[in-house]
Amino acid sequence: MFPGGRYFTVVCAFSHRNNDDPIMHSRHPGLSHNHTYAGNRSVDAFSTSASLRSGSTTCDFPQDASGYWAPTLYMGREPIQPMAVLVYYVKRTTADVVPFPADLEIVAGDATARKAQRKSIVSWGCDGFGGSKRYALIPACAKERTLDLRVQFPNCWNGKTSDSPDHKSHMAYSTGGKCPASHPVAVPTMLLILLYLPVPEAAQVVSGRFGAHADFMNGWDQDTFSTFVAGLNY
């Protein structure tokens, strides 16, 4: 049952859009496709975890100045702004979870995908969140429903590096509540959920109809985050 374990939730508003990506194209402004940001208000191509912590946030916890972003959803040439962004931090391992390293950067999902991604990682739905039917492509939601994009981040860390050349291989997904030997450190699963008003099926994210994904750059106050994460183990 969603979300699949003990959890705490951060609720964030839309912040801004730009053509930057401080993880994939660090220090190269304008090189990325358009991104929609929530959380930290100042994310750009030059952002780092340290710089984020000195900024402000759209999230309901002021101690969370992290950057959360995803490719912008478009209907034709019109960008569509999410109504809200939810971030579930969930314990999904049998081992206790520990906080992320202070400068962790993660990408989940594949911007270059040209076929359906695993729906356990990237999916769309019409119920906003929870156990609704999941789709590989944007569904035609009824007017009274809420379209959502859900991206699940990996929850096992190699314990050594806060990033990697592909921005993914320092992390892995658990299987049956167990982390692989290559990534033995259990951390919370992040479920990033972007909520939208229903859109026509012709709408798509700028990275392509199958290319939904999301990025995270840690900007938490580490003492606060450590306290929240410790609570997931009891």
Task: Outline where the language-model segments fall.
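Primary mode marks residue(s) on the alpha4-beta5-alpha5 output face of response regulator receiver
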Residues: M1-S32, T36-V151, N158-Y234
